[in-house]
């Protein structure tokens, strides 16, 4: 009994000692942290080959109904690297910058080059930054875009996230690129990453996203127009809600495309594994949403042929333009590399063949109605 009594006392002392050496909390209180909703990267003005980092910080408020609009603070700092600038920003505030909820990274248009991996490396290495964060280009600057607060932006929300998330805006003119996807495509041979380009109006109270940028090693990145961005989305990402304007003589048709699918295969050159052509087949389904003349459902096959011919010309023109500029946003080269037996000169052979490859495009438009009731 005496032994059991000593054992019990030993357990009590051991438990008390363990409680004394425990920390009160492993994390900082929520009121000691500032949550960054977006971050912008611009070329530094006062630091040679440096960067200007701007963070958009969400300010807390009591209740959503007590706030008429979102409340944000903006902090900026220049540094030789992204990490250095962010560390210096922490000396400007009395709290800790929390990056775990950040979903949008905005990069100045002039920084969208192949060497952007040197500063994007910071976001990949930090464990608290989500790899599913959206990455976009900015014009005229990332700081300007971050400070735009649209009138449609609701309290406790960030408009930038709604543009790229599938839960809100689903426009076919908006390209969505994730951080992990950008990193993967930059390091891969045979594909050029494509990022959305965010702009603003003259008043600075609206965000406009209907252009995109093809990332390449050039000093001035290639910007895709609104129409070219739509073609890219419809072919590669099978976006819905597309519209195509078809003209023949005095007849004008506006097609509302609800489904789009592209398949292609390489046509090899005789006696060589290098492709001489790309045989591409595109199927689109939709209805006629608008017309300047009366339409008849009996002529639906005629409208299909007319639409197929017009859409083919538009898409072929876009593909040839990308080829002439030696850009490959669709990743034809990457597909070729990954479906062939590896050799040291495989990608070199593709680079030599790509400028002369012929695009054989077949478009099949299947209109399901004229949008009218007879």
Regions found by a protein language model. Name each.
Residues 2-374:
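Membrane-proximal alpha-helical signals and transmembrane carboxylates
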